[in-house]
Curated annotation (Swiss-Prot):
Catalytic function, reaction form: ATP + [prokaryotic ubiquitin-like protein]-L-glutamate + [protein]-L-lysine = ADP + phosphate + N(6)-([prokaryotic ubiquitin-like protein]-gamma-L-glutamyl)-[protein]-L-lysine
Annotated binding of ATP, by residue: R53, T66, W419
Pathway in which this enzyme or protein is active: Protein degradation; proteasomal Pup-dependent pathway; Protein modification; protein pupylation
Recorded GO MF terms: ATP binding; ligase activity, forming carbon-nitrogen bonds; magnesium ion binding; ubiquitin-like protein transferase activity
Designated name of the protein: Pup--protein ligase
Entry keyword set: ATP-binding, Ligase, Magnesium, Metal-binding, Nucleotide-binding, Ubl conjugation pathway
Enzyme kind, highest EC tier: ligase
More info: The reaction mechanism probably proceeds via the activation of Pup by phosphorylation of its C-terminal glutamate, which is then subject to nucleophilic attack by the substrate lysine, resulting in an isopeptide bond and the release of phosphate as a good leaving group.
Family according to the record: Belongs to the Pup ligase/Pup deamidase family. Pup-conjugating enzyme subfamily.
Pfam families: Pup_ligase (PF03136)
Sequence positions that bind Mg(2+): E9, Y55, E63
E.C. designation(s): 6.3.1.19
Record's keyword annotation contains Membrane: no
Length: 452
Protein backbone atom coordinates (compact mmCIF):
# COMPACT_ATOMS: atom_id res chain seq x y z
CA UNK A 1 0.00 0.00 0.00
CA UNK A 2 1.93 3.03 -1.28
CA UNK A 3 -0.84 5.46 -0.35
CA UNK A 4 -1.87 4.93 3.25
CA UNK A 5 -4.41 6.52 5.58
CA UNK A 6 -2.78 7.64 8.84
CA UNK A 7 -3.78 9.56 11.93
CA UNK A 8 -2.45 10.60 15.33
CA UNK A 9 -4.39 10.78 18.62
CA UNK A 10 -2.81 12.91 21.34
CA UNK A 11 -3.82 13.15 24.99
CA UNK A 12 -2.73 16.35 26.74
CA UNK A 13 -1.77 16.82 30.37
CA UNK A 14 -3.64 19.60 32.22
CA UNK A 15 -2.71 21.66 35.25
CA UNK A 16 -3.55 25.11 36.59
CA UNK A 17 -1.83 27.57 38.91
CA UNK A 18 -4.26 29.79 40.80
CA UNK A 19 -3.81 33.43 41.76
CA UNK A 20 -6.36 33.56 44.57
CA UNK A 21 -7.62 31.31 47.37
CA UNK A 22 -10.09 29.36 45.20
CA UNK A 23 -8.76 26.06 43.86
CA UNK A 24 -10.16 23.76 41.18
CA UNK A 25 -9.49 20.07 40.65
CA UNK A 26 -8.03 18.87 37.32
CA UNK A 27 -11.53 17.58 36.45
CA UNK A 28 -13.00 21.05 36.98
CA UNK A 29 -10.21 22.72 34.98
CA UNK A 30 -10.83 20.29 32.11
CA UNK A 31 -14.54 21.13 32.19
CA UNK A 32 -13.71 24.85 31.94
CA UNK A 33 -11.57 24.00 28.91
CA UNK A 34 -14.49 22.27 27.23
CA UNK A 35 -17.26 24.71 28.15
CA UNK A 36 -17.12 26.41 24.75
CA UNK A 37 -17.11 23.03 23.02
CA UNK A 38 -20.13 21.84 25.00
CA UNK A 39 -21.96 25.13 24.34
CA UNK A 40 -22.04 24.53 20.58
CA UNK A 41 -21.60 20.75 20.38
CA UNK A 42 -23.83 19.81 23.36
CA UNK A 43 -21.14 17.28 24.26
CA UNK A 44 -17.49 17.02 25.28
CA UNK A 45 -17.01 14.58 22.39
CA UNK A 46 -17.26 16.36 19.04
CA UNK A 47 -16.03 16.34 15.46
CA UNK A 48 -14.68 19.62 14.09
CA UNK A 49 -14.90 21.37 10.74
CA UNK A 50 -11.39 20.20 9.92
CA UNK A 51 -12.53 16.58 10.23
CA UNK A 52 -10.78 15.96 13.56
CA UNK A 53 -12.28 14.57 16.75
CA UNK A 54 -11.92 16.46 20.03
CA UNK A 55 -12.99 14.95 23.31
CA UNK A 56 -12.36 14.69 27.03
CA UNK A 57 -10.71 11.32 27.66
CA UNK A 58 -10.47 9.34 30.90
CA UNK A 59 -8.61 11.09 33.70
CA UNK A 60 -9.46 14.65 32.59
CA UNK A 61 -7.15 14.49 29.57
CA UNK A 62 -8.25 16.45 26.50
CA UNK A 63 -7.65 14.31 23.43
CA UNK A 64 -7.32 15.41 19.81
CA UNK A 65 -7.52 12.85 17.01
CA UNK A 66 -6.43 14.19 13.63
CA UNK A 67 -8.56 13.69 10.57
CA UNK A 68 -7.53 10.98 8.11
CA UNK A 69 -4.33 12.01 6.30
CA UNK A 70 -2.58 10.34 3.37
CA UNK A 71 0.84 11.97 3.40
CA UNK A 72 3.37 12.70 6.12
CA UNK A 73 3.57 16.50 5.97
CA UNK A 74 -0.22 16.71 5.89
CA UNK A 75 -0.35 14.55 9.03
CA UNK A 76 2.29 16.61 10.85
CA UNK A 77 0.40 19.79 9.93
CA UNK A 78 -2.90 18.45 11.28
CA UNK A 79 -1.18 17.17 14.42
CA UNK A 80 0.14 20.70 15.02
CA UNK A 81 -3.33 22.10 14.30
CA UNK A 82 -4.53 20.09 17.29
CA UNK A 83 -2.13 22.03 19.52
CA UNK A 84 -3.55 25.31 18.21
CA UNK A 85 -7.15 24.15 18.75
CA UNK A 86 -6.36 23.22 22.37
CA UNK A 87 -4.43 26.45 22.92
CA UNK A 88 -7.49 28.40 21.76
CA UNK A 89 -9.62 26.54 24.34
CA UNK A 90 -6.98 27.31 26.99
CA UNK A 91 -7.14 31.07 26.33
CA UNK A 92 -10.95 30.97 26.41
CA UNK A 93 -10.98 28.99 29.68
CA UNK A 94 -8.55 31.39 31.37
CA UNK A 95 -10.86 34.27 30.44
CA UNK A 96 -13.84 32.40 31.91
CA UNK A 97 -11.90 31.82 35.14
CA UNK A 98 -11.03 35.53 35.31
CA UNK A 99 -14.65 36.53 34.64
CA UNK A 100 -15.78 34.35 37.54
CA UNK A 101 -13.15 35.75 39.89
CA UNK A 102 -10.98 32.63 39.84
CA UNK A 103 -7.67 33.93 38.55
CA UNK A 104 -5.47 31.21 37.14
CA UNK A 105 -3.03 30.14 34.45
CA UNK A 106 -3.90 26.91 32.66
CA UNK A 107 -1.14 24.73 31.25
CA UNK A 108 -1.58 22.08 28.58
CA UNK A 109 1.34 19.72 28.09
CA UNK A 110 1.95 17.59 25.02
CA UNK A 111 3.89 15.00 26.99
CA UNK A 112 3.26 11.51 28.36
CA UNK A 113 3.79 11.57 32.14
CA UNK A 114 2.81 13.76 35.07
CA UNK A 115 4.49 14.37 38.43
CA UNK A 116 2.35 11.67 40.06
CA UNK A 117 3.69 9.02 37.69
CA UNK A 118 0.54 8.73 35.58
CA UNK A 119 0.95 8.19 31.84
CA UNK A 120 -1.18 9.31 28.90
CA UNK A 121 -0.58 8.54 25.31
CA UNK A 122 0.11 9.43 21.75
CA UNK A 123 -1.49 6.79 19.54
CA UNK A 124 -0.67 6.29 15.88
CA UNK A 125 -3.14 4.77 13.41
CA UNK A 126 -2.21 3.15 10.11
CA UNK A 127 -4.64 1.60 7.66
CA UNK A 128 -3.49 -1.87 6.57
CA UNK A 129 -5.03 -4.43 4.23
CA UNK A 130 -7.12 -7.17 5.82
CA UNK A 131 -5.50 -9.90 3.69
CA UNK A 132 -2.38 -11.51 5.10
CA UNK A 133 -1.35 -12.57 8.57
CA UNK A 134 -1.44 -9.84 11.21
CA UNK A 135 1.17 -11.80 13.16
CA UNK A 136 3.70 -11.22 10.35
CA UNK A 137 3.27 -7.46 10.78
CA UNK A 138 3.43 -7.57 14.57
CA UNK A 139 6.46 -9.92 14.56
CA UNK A 140 8.50 -7.45 12.48
CA UNK A 141 7.05 -4.31 14.03
CA UNK A 142 7.58 -5.20 17.71
CA UNK A 143 11.41 -5.06 17.65
CA UNK A 144 11.20 -1.97 15.43
CA UNK A 145 8.87 -0.15 17.84
CA UNK A 146 10.84 -1.18 20.94
CA UNK A 147 14.02 0.33 19.44
CA UNK A 148 12.40 3.23 17.53
CA UNK A 149 12.77 5.48 20.59
CA UNK A 150 16.44 5.84 19.58
CA UNK A 151 15.34 7.97 16.65
CA UNK A 152 12.13 9.62 17.87
CA UNK A 153 11.89 9.55 21.67
CA UNK A 154 10.80 12.78 23.36
CA UNK A 155 13.41 12.43 26.11
CA UNK A 156 12.84 12.51 29.86
CA UNK A 157 14.74 12.88 33.11
CA UNK A 158 13.81 9.86 35.20
CA UNK A 159 14.10 10.68 38.90
CA UNK A 160 14.87 7.80 41.26
CA UNK A 161 15.59 7.91 45.02
CA UNK A 162 19.31 7.50 44.27
CA UNK A 163 19.88 9.58 41.14
CA UNK A 164 18.46 11.05 37.96
CA UNK A 165 18.91 9.50 34.51
CA UNK A 166 18.26 10.95 31.09
CA UNK A 167 16.06 8.50 29.16
CA UNK A 168 15.12 8.40 25.50
CA UNK A 169 11.40 7.81 25.99
CA UNK A 170 8.65 9.11 28.26
CA UNK A 171 6.36 6.20 27.45
CA UNK A 172 8.74 3.24 27.82
CA UNK A 173 8.35 2.92 31.61
CA UNK A 174 4.58 2.60 31.25
CA UNK A 175 4.28 -0.19 28.67
CA UNK A 176 3.37 -3.61 30.05
CA UNK A 177 2.53 -5.86 27.09
CA UNK A 178 3.68 -6.51 23.54
CA UNK A 179 0.41 -7.09 21.66
CA UNK A 180 -2.99 -6.79 23.36
CA UNK A 181 -6.55 -5.56 22.89
CA UNK A 182 -6.34 -3.25 25.94
CA UNK A 183 -5.13 0.37 25.87
CA UNK A 184 -5.28 1.63 29.45
CA UNK A 185 -5.12 -1.39 31.74
CA UNK A 186 -2.02 -3.10 30.35
CA UNK A 187 -0.72 -0.54 27.82
CA UNK A 188 0.58 -2.75 25.02
CA UNK A 189 2.98 -1.71 22.27
CA UNK A 190 0.47 -2.66 19.55
CA UNK A 191 -3.26 -2.65 20.25
CA UNK A 192 -5.21 -5.35 18.41
CA UNK A 193 -8.76 -4.11 19.01
CA UNK A 194 -10.27 -4.43 15.54
CA UNK A 195 -12.02 -1.14 14.74
CA UNK A 196 -11.05 -0.32 11.13
CA UNK A 197 -13.38 2.73 10.69
CA UNK A 198 -13.50 1.52 7.09
CA UNK A 199 -14.70 -1.47 5.05
CA UNK A 200 -13.88 -4.28 7.48
CA UNK A 201 -13.65 -6.86 4.69
CA UNK A 202 -10.81 -4.91 3.03
CA UNK A 203 -9.01 -3.14 5.85
CA UNK A 204 -7.99 -3.15 9.45
CA UNK A 205 -6.43 -0.35 11.51
CA UNK A 206 -3.04 -0.81 13.13
CA UNK A 207 -3.17 1.02 16.46
CA UNK A 208 0.30 1.78 17.88
CA UNK A 209 0.24 3.14 21.43
CA UNK A 210 3.90 2.95 22.41
CA UNK A 211 5.12 6.23 20.89
CA UNK A 212 5.99 9.47 22.67
CA UNK A 213 4.20 12.75 22.00
CA UNK A 214 6.62 14.77 19.92
CA UNK A 215 7.02 18.54 19.86
CA UNK A 216 9.48 18.74 16.96
CA UNK A 217 7.84 18.45 13.55
CA UNK A 218 10.74 16.57 11.98
CA UNK A 219 10.66 14.00 14.81
CA UNK A 220 6.92 13.44 14.33
CA UNK A 221 7.50 12.99 10.60
CA UNK A 222 10.32 10.51 11.33
CA UNK A 223 8.15 8.59 13.81
CA UNK A 224 5.21 8.04 11.48
CA UNK A 225 7.30 7.90 8.30
CA UNK A 226 9.53 5.06 9.49
CA UNK A 227 6.50 3.08 10.72
CA UNK A 228 4.67 3.61 7.41
CA UNK A 229 7.76 2.47 5.51
CA UNK A 230 8.09 -0.62 7.71
CA UNK A 231 4.47 -1.54 6.96
CA UNK A 232 4.98 -1.01 3.25
CA UNK A 233 8.05 -3.26 3.28
CA UNK A 234 6.27 -6.02 5.22
CA UNK A 235 3.34 -5.85 2.79
CA UNK A 236 5.64 -6.16 -0.23
CA UNK A 237 7.53 -9.12 1.24
CA UNK A 238 10.87 -7.48 2.03
CA UNK A 239 12.87 -10.04 4.07
CA UNK A 240 14.08 -9.01 7.54
CA UNK A 241 16.44 -10.64 10.01
CA UNK A 242 14.62 -12.20 12.94
CA UNK A 243 14.91 -9.80 15.87
CA UNK A 244 12.17 -11.41 17.98
CA UNK A 245 12.75 -10.19 21.52
CA UNK A 246 13.00 -12.49 24.51
CA UNK A 247 11.16 -9.96 26.69
CA UNK A 248 9.88 -6.85 24.84
CA UNK A 249 8.85 -5.10 28.06
CA UNK A 250 12.25 -5.44 29.68
CA UNK A 251 13.91 -4.52 26.37
CA UNK A 252 11.94 -1.30 25.91
CA UNK A 253 13.14 -0.05 29.30
CA UNK A 254 16.72 -1.11 28.67
CA UNK A 255 16.77 0.73 25.34
CA UNK A 256 15.27 3.86 26.89
CA UNK A 257 18.02 4.00 29.52
CA UNK A 258 20.90 3.79 27.01
CA UNK A 259 21.50 6.80 24.74
CA UNK A 260 24.47 5.03 23.12
CA UNK A 261 22.17 2.39 21.63
CA UNK A 262 24.90 -0.21 22.24
CA UNK A 263 23.58 -2.10 25.25
CA UNK A 264 22.86 -5.71 24.20
CA UNK A 265 19.18 -6.64 24.17
CA UNK A 266 18.30 -10.30 24.65
CA UNK A 267 16.58 -11.87 21.65
CA UNK A 268 14.49 -15.04 21.51
CA UNK A 269 16.66 -18.15 21.57
CA UNK A 270 19.38 -16.53 23.66
CA UNK A 271 20.91 -14.35 20.94
CA UNK A 272 21.73 -10.68 21.51
CA UNK A 273 21.66 -7.49 19.45
CA UNK A 274 21.91 -3.81 20.29
CA UNK A 275 19.13 -1.32 19.58
CA UNK A 276 21.52 0.39 17.18
CA UNK A 277 22.11 -2.91 15.31
CA UNK A 278 18.37 -3.52 15.02
CA UNK A 279 17.57 -0.01 13.79
CA UNK A 280 20.51 -0.09 11.37
CA UNK A 281 19.13 -3.27 9.78
CA UNK A 282 15.69 -1.70 9.32
CA UNK A 283 17.21 1.52 7.99
CA UNK A 284 19.30 -0.40 5.43
CA UNK A 285 16.23 -2.28 4.18
CA UNK A 286 14.28 0.99 3.93
CA UNK A 287 17.10 2.69 2.02
CA UNK A 288 17.18 -0.22 -0.45
CA UNK A 289 13.37 -0.26 -0.70
CA UNK A 290 13.30 3.40 -1.73
CA UNK A 291 15.42 2.55 -4.77
CA UNK A 292 12.72 0.18 -6.04
CA UNK A 293 9.45 2.01 -5.24
CA UNK A 294 8.10 5.06 -7.06
CA UNK A 295 9.86 8.27 -5.92
CA UNK A 296 8.53 9.92 -2.76
CA UNK A 297 10.32 13.05 -1.53
CA UNK A 298 8.85 12.80 1.98
CA UNK A 299 10.03 9.22 2.46
CA UNK A 300 13.45 10.20 1.11
CA UNK A 301 13.64 12.94 3.78
CA UNK A 302 12.59 10.43 6.45
CA UNK A 303 15.23 7.87 5.47
CA UNK A 304 17.90 10.58 5.25
CA UNK A 305 17.17 11.75 8.83
CA UNK A 306 16.90 8.14 10.01
CA UNK A 307 20.41 7.44 8.75
CA UNK A 308 21.87 10.68 10.11
CA UNK A 309 20.39 10.01 13.55
CA UNK A 310 21.82 6.48 13.65
CA UNK A 311 25.22 7.87 12.61
CA UNK A 312 24.95 10.49 15.36
CA UNK A 313 24.18 7.84 17.98
CA UNK A 314 27.06 5.67 16.79
CA UNK A 315 29.56 8.56 16.95
CA UNK A 316 27.84 10.28 19.92
CA UNK A 317 28.25 13.51 17.92
CA UNK A 318 24.77 14.98 17.57
CA UNK A 319 25.70 18.27 15.89
CA UNK A 320 24.08 17.27 12.57
CA UNK A 321 20.71 16.36 14.12
CA UNK A 322 20.46 18.66 17.15
CA UNK A 323 17.56 20.67 15.69
CA UNK A 324 15.60 17.68 14.35
CA UNK A 325 15.20 15.05 17.11
CA UNK A 326 13.25 15.84 20.28
CA UNK A 327 15.40 13.95 22.79
CA UNK A 328 18.59 15.38 21.30
CA UNK A 329 17.22 18.94 21.42
CA UNK A 330 16.07 18.46 25.01
CA UNK A 331 19.32 16.87 26.18
CA UNK A 332 21.34 19.70 24.63
CA UNK A 333 19.09 22.21 26.41
CA UNK A 334 19.62 20.49 29.78
CA UNK A 335 23.38 20.31 29.25
CA UNK A 336 23.48 24.04 28.51
CA UNK A 337 21.70 24.84 31.79
CA UNK A 338 23.83 22.36 33.74
CA UNK A 339 27.06 23.85 32.40
CA UNK A 340 25.93 27.45 32.91
CA UNK A 341 24.55 27.07 36.42
CA UNK A 342 26.65 24.10 37.59
CA UNK A 343 23.55 22.04 38.37
CA UNK A 344 22.91 18.29 38.47
CA UNK A 345 20.14 16.44 36.61
CA UNK A 346 18.46 16.05 40.01
CA UNK A 347 18.01 19.83 40.30
CA UNK A 348 14.28 20.78 40.41
CA UNK A 349 14.95 23.40 37.71
CA UNK A 350 15.75 20.59 35.26
CA UNK A 351 12.44 18.88 36.06
CA UNK A 352 10.69 22.22 35.52
CA UNK A 353 12.47 22.68 32.19
CA UNK A 354 11.56 19.11 31.18
CA UNK A 355 7.89 19.93 31.69
CA UNK A 356 8.02 23.43 30.18
CA UNK A 357 9.47 21.97 26.97
CA UNK A 358 6.03 20.42 26.34
CA UNK A 359 3.92 23.51 27.17
CA UNK A 360 1.88 24.10 23.98
CA UNK A 361 1.13 27.78 24.62
CA UNK A 362 2.99 29.86 22.06
CA UNK A 363 5.26 32.49 23.56
CA UNK A 364 5.46 30.59 26.86
CA UNK A 365 6.40 26.99 26.06
CA UNK A 366 10.13 26.29 25.92
CA UNK A 367 9.95 24.28 22.70
CA UNK A 368 8.09 27.12 20.97
CA UNK A 369 10.82 29.55 22.04
CA UNK A 370 13.49 27.21 20.64
CA UNK A 371 11.58 26.90 17.39
CA UNK A 372 11.28 30.68 17.06
CA UNK A 373 15.06 30.94 17.47
CA UNK A 374 15.63 28.42 14.69
CA UNK A 375 16.84 25.77 17.13
CA UNK A 376 14.12 23.30 16.10
CA UNK A 377 13.56 22.33 12.46
CA UNK A 378 10.17 22.47 10.75
CA UNK A 379 8.32 20.80 7.89
CA UNK A 380 5.18 22.98 8.07
CA UNK A 381 4.43 26.70 8.22
CA UNK A 382 2.20 28.67 10.57
CA UNK A 383 0.01 29.52 7.56
CA UNK A 384 -0.52 25.82 6.77
CA UNK A 385 -1.30 25.03 10.42
CA UNK A 386 -3.83 27.89 10.59
CA UNK A 387 -5.49 26.50 7.45
CA UNK A 388 -5.57 22.99 8.98
CA UNK A 389 -7.33 24.35 12.08
CA UNK A 390 -10.28 25.31 9.88
CA UNK A 391 -10.17 22.96 6.90
CA UNK A 392 -9.93 19.16 6.54
CA UNK A 393 -7.38 17.33 4.40
CA UNK A 394 -8.65 17.61 0.83
CA UNK A 395 -7.49 14.17 -0.33
CA UNK A 396 -9.31 11.81 2.08
CA UNK A 397 -12.76 11.06 3.52
CA UNK A 398 -12.10 13.84 6.07
CA UNK A 399 -13.05 16.34 3.36
CA UNK A 400 -16.58 14.90 3.19
CA UNK A 401 -16.97 15.04 6.97
CA UNK A 402 -15.59 18.56 7.24
CA UNK A 403 -17.78 19.92 4.44
CA UNK A 404 -20.86 18.24 5.92
CA UNK A 405 -20.21 19.67 9.40
CA UNK A 406 -19.57 23.18 8.01
CA UNK A 407 -22.75 23.09 5.91
CA UNK A 408 -24.91 21.72 8.74
CA UNK A 409 -23.63 24.33 11.20
CA UNK A 410 -24.17 27.15 8.69
CA UNK A 411 -27.72 25.94 8.05
CA UNK A 412 -28.45 25.51 11.75
CA UNK A 413 -29.28 21.84 11.26
CA UNK A 414 -29.08 19.16 13.92
CA UNK A 415 -26.61 16.46 12.87
CA UNK A 416 -24.57 13.51 14.09
CA UNK A 417 -21.23 12.35 12.71
CA UNK A 418 -18.56 9.78 13.48
CA UNK A 419 -15.63 8.43 11.46
CA UNK A 420 -17.89 6.66 8.92
CA UNK A 421 -21.41 8.12 9.30
CA UNK A 422 -22.87 11.51 8.33
CA UNK A 423 -26.43 11.92 9.60
CA UNK A 424 -29.03 14.68 9.51
CA UNK A 425 -31.26 14.37 12.56
CA UNK A 426 -34.44 15.43 10.79
CA UNK A 427 -37.67 13.52 10.29
CA UNK A 428 -36.15 11.46 7.51
CA UNK A 429 -33.08 10.58 9.62
CA UNK A 430 -30.96 10.64 6.47
CA UNK A 431 -27.56 8.96 6.84
CA UNK A 432 -24.65 8.48 4.46
CA UNK A 433 -22.19 5.69 5.22
CA UNK A 434 -18.64 6.55 4.09
CA UNK A 435 -16.68 3.30 4.29
CA UNK A 436 -13.85 4.28 1.95
CA UNK A 437 -11.34 6.53 3.78
CA UNK A 438 -9.51 7.27 0.50
CA UNK A 439 -12.61 8.81 -1.09
CA UNK A 440 -12.73 12.61 -0.95
CA UNK A 441 -15.66 13.12 -3.37
CA UNK A 442 -19.06 11.46 -2.98
CA UNK A 443 -22.28 12.38 -4.82
CA UNK A 444 -24.40 11.09 -1.92
CA UNK A 445 -22.76 13.57 0.44
CA UNK A 446 -23.20 16.38 -2.09
CA UNK A 447 -26.93 15.61 -2.28
CA UNK A 448 -27.21 15.48 1.52
CA UNK A 449 -25.54 18.90 1.80
CA UNK A 450 -27.68 20.33 -1.01
CA UNK A 451 -30.84 19.24 0.82
CA UNK A 452 -30.13 21.42 3.86
Amino acid sequence: MQRRIMGIETEFGVTCTFHGHRRLSPDEVARYLFRRVVSWGRSSNVFLRNGARLYLDVGSHPEYATAECDNLVQLVTHDRAGEWVLEDLLVDAEQRLADEGIGGDIYLFKNNTDSAGNSYGCHENYLIVRAGEFSRISDVLLPFLVTRQLICGAGKVLQTPKAATFCLSQRAEHIWEGVSSATTRSRPIINTRDEPHADAEKYRRLHVIVGDSNMCETTTMLKVGTAALMLEMVETGVPFRDFSLDNPIRAIREVSHDITGRRPVRLAGGRQASALDIQREYYTRAFEHLQTREPNVQFEQVVDLWGRQLDAIESQDFAKVDTEIDWVIKRKLFQRYQDRDNMELTDPKIAQLDLAYHDIKRGRGVFDLLQRKGLAARVTTDEDIADAVNHPPQTTRARLRGEFISAAQAAGRDFTVDWVHLKLNDQAQRTVLCKDPFRAVDERVKRLIASM
